[in-house]
Amino acid sequence: MADLATIARPYAEALFQSAKPAELAGCLEQLNELAQLAALPEVAALSNNPKVSADDLSKLLSGMVKTKLDPKVASFLNLVNQNHRLVAVPEIAHQFEAMKNKSEGAAEVNITSAFPLEGSALNDLLSSLKKRFGGKELRPTIQVDPTLIGGVRIQVGDEVMDSSVKVQLAQMQASLGA
């Protein structure tokens, strides 16, 4: 089977191009909801069951989401189910979000810290990152990982900046030849 990102890209592009700028946020919200459902083992089992038609699966999933699906998203869901690509929906949602952010001049930022970041420390970090990335609007996701010991690990797109104590210790160990 081809790489999931390769399979997902045309679906994400098609949905992105069919949505108007004002519809992007709503489509993304519904797509993320469908991605969560598609990741459930029970839903995966249904999608692989030859007795369950693509239309039935689409109706079932449409009924499981919180709000009525936008017609574009409903059509997208039918297409995905007809092509037996429900497994790719989480990756499609990820790529759709990246396209939305790019069109809005924004970037997702994953920040992992050894300790909770709050208040002025978080604001200072985001301010520095905003300057570093050309004034883009940053949409942070913050996680705490005590194994970092100290410092932060920041990922924006493909770029990773790791100033954690864990990485510094590993670099010292490598340089000492231990």
Swiss-Prot record:
Keywords: ATP synthesis, Cell inner membrane, Cell membrane, CF(1), Hydrogen ion transport, Ion transport, Membrane, Transport. Its main location: membrane. The keyword Transport applies. It is a peripheral membrane protein. SUPFAM superfamilies: N-terminal domain of the delta subunit of the F1F0-ATP synthase. One of its GO terms (molecular function) is proton-transporting ATP synthase activity, rotational mechanism. It is found in: Cell inner membrane. Pfam families: OSCP. GO terms for cellular component: plasma membrane; proton-transporting ATP synthase complex. Disulfide bonds: none annotated. NCBIfam families: ATP_synt_delta, PRK05758.2-2. F(1)F(0) ATP synthase produces ATP from ADP in the presence of a proton or sodium gradient. F-type ATPases consist of two structural domains, F(1) containing the extramembraneous catalytic core and F(0) containing the membrane proton channel, linked together by a central stalk and a peripheral stalk. During catalysis, ATP synthesis in the catalytic domain of F(1) is coupled via a rotary mechanism of the central stalk subunits to proton translocation. This protein is part of the stalk that links CF(0) to CF(1). It either transmits conformational changes from CF(0) to CF(1) or is implicated in proton conduction. Belongs to the ATPase delta chain family. F-type ATPases have 2 components, F(1) - the catalytic core - and F(0) - the membrane proton channel. F(1) has five subunits: alpha(3), beta(3), gamma(1), delta(1), epsilon(1). F(0) has three main subunits: a(1), b(2) and c(10-14). The alpha and beta chains form an alternating ring which encloses part of the gamma chain. F(1) is attached to F(0) by a central stalk formed by the gamma and epsilon chains, while a peripheral stalk is formed by the delta and b chains. This is ATP synthase subunit delta. It comes from Polynucleobacter necessarius subsp. necessarius (strain STIR1).
